[in-house]
A protein has these predicted regions:
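Non-transmembrane, aqueous-exposed alpha-helical and coiled segments at domain scale
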Residues: 1-428
Length: 428
């Protein structure tokens, strides 16, 4: 059976923890899109880890972790992450890398930085991980697949052609140093040697695993609102963040995905620019940021303070719908225990009209939140294992959110650890 774990919102919802938890029963875990531009934090018996490329299953001996063909693979980051966990006594994980995955080139990171500099105040808030230039090249058909590292003659010729194009931009648009073909070729030979032990046809491997009845978990990055088609365009990432793309980015048939666990945070947070209707500011935001997440709400990749807001039913319902949600995992609920009252965004007012539908970007930028306030529970809920043992106002908050988003909340996370999870039967 194939399951997917994806985000409903801007990312940072807590997917890493949910994937880590579900990985106990998984045979294979796959990263199917994105690159090192977003991180996920995992707390387990080995300690606290912020991963950017490795799937969350690397902490289990029984799992195989796969980097799928849809991933933007930064090979040095990938290797360094393996070392970062094995240096902390995590056993060497079993990892496979798709021979069709494409490589983040050194110049992709440079072009990302140069473009942000050029745009100045109009920048997209990039993590400067090379993601947009990488995907631009992929779809312009001038990217490099992992398998091309093993075709020395073809690689050198293609590299010369691509560098010629890149150097025109470097000279005339960015006014930066030009690329050296020989230097890049030597770097790619190093990449080849680094990645060689992991490379295989992962699609064929997964086809065999599905036929054998293996439990397979697709691990998504970011969330619906960062999807290039359905997100808050252009403040989006460059690869699809939807569960549907899991089939493409892993190389499996779409009908094999039987369960989609969409992760929603009990409040909202976002990194980078763009419309954020339920956003809060000042001391109110700072306190939620300080108390939030695991050690504060700061980007796992950039360390930037996350923008904070109340739970947004409009955005979350939309996010769950686009993901094809079968189950909602509701995370970081324990963070809200300090509040006397908890506002929830249940609608948007756009040009004097209230809507519960998520609008296109230019309308979203004019939207004002319609808030309903619920009573808080004013206590620490960490350590509770049964839904009925949660405070009444806490249960009412969960049930209010569930009723407004229209998708069943079957898991509630009330702490950062693997054991901090409550399963519940939904009335939906």
């Amino acid at each position: 059976m194939v399951k997917a774990v994806v985000g409903a919102n801007w990312g940072d919802e807590g997917k890493g923890k949910i994937t880590d938890m579900l990985a106990r029963k998984a045979d294979i875990i796959i990263r199917f899109q994105g690159g090192a531009n977003a991180g996920h934090t995992i707390v387990n018996d080995y300690g606290k880890f912020a991963l950017h490329t490795l799937p969350s299953g690397v902490f289990y001996r029984h799992t195989t972790s796969i980097i799928g063909n849809g991933v933007a693979l930064n090979i040095p980051v990938f290797i360094n992450e393996i070392h970062s966990i094995t240096d902390r006594n995590v056993p060497m994980p079993n990892i496979l890398v798709s021979d069709r995955a494409q490589i983040v080139m050194p110049y992709h990171i440079l072009f990302d930085q140069y473009e942000e500099e050029r745009l100045g105040g109009k920048s997209f808030g990039s993590t400067k991980s090379g993601i947009a230039p990488f995907y631009s090249d992929k779809y312009a058909k001038i990217g490099f697949q992992v398998c091309e590292l093993f075709d020395e003659e073809g690689l050198k010729g293609k590299l010369a052609s691509v560098c010629e194009t890149k150097n025109v931009l470097l000279e005339h648009l960015y006014h930066k140093p030009l690329l050296d073909v020989e230097e890049l070729y030597a770097t790619l030979q190093e990449y080849r040697d680094m990645i060689a032990p992991f490379v295989c046809d992962t699609s064929a491997y997964l086809d065999k695993a599905i036929k054998e009845g293996k439990n397979i978990l697709l691990e998504g990055q970011l969330g619906t609102l960062k999807d290039p088609d359905h997100g808050i365009y252009p403040m989006v990432t460059s690869s699809s963040t939807l569960a549907a793309y899991g089939a493409i980015g892993a190389g499996i048939p779409p009908y094999e995905i039987r369960q989609v666990v969409t992760v929603c945070k009990a409040y909202s947070s976002a990194v980078g620019a763009g419309a954020f209707v339920s956003e809060i500011f000042g001391e109110e935001a700072e306190e939620l940021r300080r108390r939030g997440g695991d050690g504060g709400e700061y980007g796992a990749t950039t360390g930037r303070p996350r923008r904070m807001g109340w739970f947004d039913c409009v955005a979350s319902r939309y996010g769950c719908r686009l993901q094809g949600t079968t189950d909602v995992a509701f995370t970081v609920l324990d963070v809200l225990g300090y509040l006397d009252e908890i506002p929830v965004c249940t609608g948007y007012e756009v040009d004097g009209t209230v809507t519960e539908d998520f609008p296109v970007t230019w309308k979203l930028e004019k939207a004002k939140p319609v808030l309903e306030t619920l009573p808080g529970w004013k206590c620490d809920i960490r350590g509770i294992r049964k839904y009925e043992d949660l405070p009444e106002n806490c249960r009412k908050y969960i049930e209010f959110v569930e009723a407004h988003i229209g998708y069943p909340i079957t898991m509630v996370s009330n702490g950062p650890g693997r054991e901090d999870i409550i399963y519940r039967q939904s009335a939906l």
